[in-house]
């Protein structure tokens, strides 16, 4: 039974999709004004892992993740570089796709952009004005937050407390325009030199929150299963999305809210963020760290928990990944000479492990417990590889399940079915030299292979080789 922690209820709930066998989910994507840092990547990796597990469980997943390409940060960055805002946004969208591809993140079913949905956004805002949930002032349009009776429920905050906080963080100009300090912008009047579009309220551009409401409901419907994002988006972004969407449709917006934890760095476990200037971009880290190691490191922590970034933790992830790789290579090698048929004991052990894996992952995607079972499966691969007699169908069953679990964590190892002919020939030549007790030649071949990054392992079943 699959359970997910719902931020709205603050508890784990049994997951029941709106449409049997299908999951529709929306995950807030990046504001594209810079390269993504590993804190941004954590969210993308966490929800890619969740999506992959849903697919492993047999669900058809429609996964939408947006690009915010109209925003104050983009306008400011473009002003500094001299680029047009949408050109700068496109440059960093391309960089995002390159980084996430390297991290083994599957492309979303759709990657909508705010700039491509301006007519839909204007229509959405007008509907809110018509229903008296919004009002226009001097080209700006604001949402009447207090009118929405459920405002504050997602973040579990009292409206009066929100008012006190909002009053301390808005300008005098905003305070003069707004009916209430907690009201927020749906549409912003154009400023000189800024990108803008024509609207019933004059030239302007959309607010951040309205963009996600429009993109998600247009592509997934008025009500969909899961909305995800970082914990920092819970308020005000997701709170405001709910207010806008449910005021317009009079329907529940999202059934399950999922929020991932932060990446921390340094001795004080400070949150990694661009605003604090303590971030490391994926673009830069890829120059020195294998992206698959970074992916495995990130995917190995339950999505709601914080991740501490450190060289030590990366090294541990690399070592764990290598153990998993070696286990696969060991059993793959035994395909040679395997007898046809199935080993009933292996079938039974594999089923037990599958049941344990699903039980672990069904508990709010508990990847730590899931990885424990994955390493137990790796142990079984190694043990079976050392058996004197192995069955071909059992090898295939073990490797197929192993690969399916690895892929949930974004790990794909190169198949060892077709070994390099030259290396194979050298291994056979070394075996012949050993049989002839020509140990000098045997050692010379071992050294030659080692120089190519090939490690040899002498076992009772023959010599195996693997790449470092």
Curated annotation (Swiss-Prot):
Keyword Cytoplasm applies: yes
GO molecular function terms attached to this record: ATP binding; cysteine-tRNA ligase activity; zinc ion binding
GO CC term (a single one): cytosol
InterPro entries: Cys-tRNA-ligase, Cys-tRNA-synt_Ia_DALR, Cys-tRNA/MSH_ligase, CysS_C, Rossmann-like_a/b/a_fold, tRNA-synt_1_cat_dom, tRNAsynth_Ia_anticodon-bd
Binding, ATP: 274
Binding site for Zn(2+): 28, 212, 237, 241
Known partners and oligomeric status: Monomer.
Protein name: Cysteine--tRNA ligase
Source species: Lacticaseibacillus paracasei (strain ATCC 334 / BCRC 17002 / CCUG 31169 / CIP 107868 / KCTC 3260 / NRRL B-441) (Lactobacillus paracasei)
Source species taxonomy: Bacteria, Bacillati, Bacillota, Bacilli, Lactobacillales
Primary gene name: cysS
């Amino acid at each position: 039974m699959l359970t997910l922690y719902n931020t709205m209820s603050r508890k784990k709930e049994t997951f029941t999709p709106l449409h049997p066998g299908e999951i529709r989910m929306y995950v807030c994507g990046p504001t594209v004004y810079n390269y993504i840092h590993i804190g941004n990547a954590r969210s993308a990796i966490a929800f890619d892992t969740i999506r992959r597990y849903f697919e492993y469980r047999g669900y058809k997943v429609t996964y939408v993740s947006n690009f915010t390409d109209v925003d104050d940060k983009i306008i400011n960055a473009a002003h500094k570089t001299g680029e047009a805002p949408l050109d700068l946004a496109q440059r960093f969208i391309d960089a995002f796709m390159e980084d996430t591809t390297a991290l083994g993140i599957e492309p979303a079913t759709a990657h909508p952009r705010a700039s491509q949905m301006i007519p839909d956004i204007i229509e959405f805002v007008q509907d809110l004005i018509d229903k008296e949930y919004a009002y226009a002032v001097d080209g700006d349009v604001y949402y009447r937050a207090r009118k929405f009776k459920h405002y504050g429920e997602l973040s579990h905050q009292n409206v009066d407390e929100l008012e006190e906080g909002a009053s301390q963080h808005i300008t005098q100009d905003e305070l003069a325009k707004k009916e209430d300090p907690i009201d927020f912008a749906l549409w912003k009047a154009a400023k000189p030199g800024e990108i803008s579009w024509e609207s019933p309220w004059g030239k302007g551009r959309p607010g951040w929150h309205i963009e996600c409401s429009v993109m998600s409901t247009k592509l997934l419907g008025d009500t969909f299963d899961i909305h995800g994002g970082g914990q920092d988006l819970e308020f005000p972004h997701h709170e405001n999305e709910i207010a806008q969407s449910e005021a317009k449709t009079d329907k529940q917006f999202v059934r399950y809210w999922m929020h991932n934890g932060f990446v921390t760095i340094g001795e004080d476990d400070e949150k990694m963020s661009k605003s604090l200037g303590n971030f490391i971009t994926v673009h830069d880290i890829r120059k020195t760290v294998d992206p698959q190691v970074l992916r495995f490191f990130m995917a190995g922590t339950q999505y709601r928990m914080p991740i501490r970034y450190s060289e030590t933790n990366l090294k541990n992830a690399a070592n764990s990944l290598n153990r998993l790789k070696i286990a696969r290579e060991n059993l793959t090698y035994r395909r040679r000479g395997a007898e046809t048929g199935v080993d009933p004991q292996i079938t039974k052990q594999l089923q037990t492990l599958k049941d344990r894996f699903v039980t672990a992952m069904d508990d709010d995607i508990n990847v730590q417990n899931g990885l424990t079972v994955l390493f137990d499966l790796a142990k079984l691969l190694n043990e079976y590889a050392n058996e004197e007699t192995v069955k071909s169908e059992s090898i295939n069953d073990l490797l197929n399940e192993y690969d399916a679990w690895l892929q949930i964590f974004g790990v794909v190892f190169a198949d060892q079915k077709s070994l390099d002919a030259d290396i194979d020939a050298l291994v056979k030549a070394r075996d012949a030299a050993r049989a002839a007790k020509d140990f000098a030649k045997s050692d010379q071949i071992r050294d030659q292979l080692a120089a190519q990054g090939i490690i040899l392992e002498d076992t009772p079943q023959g010599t195996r080789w693997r790449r470092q």
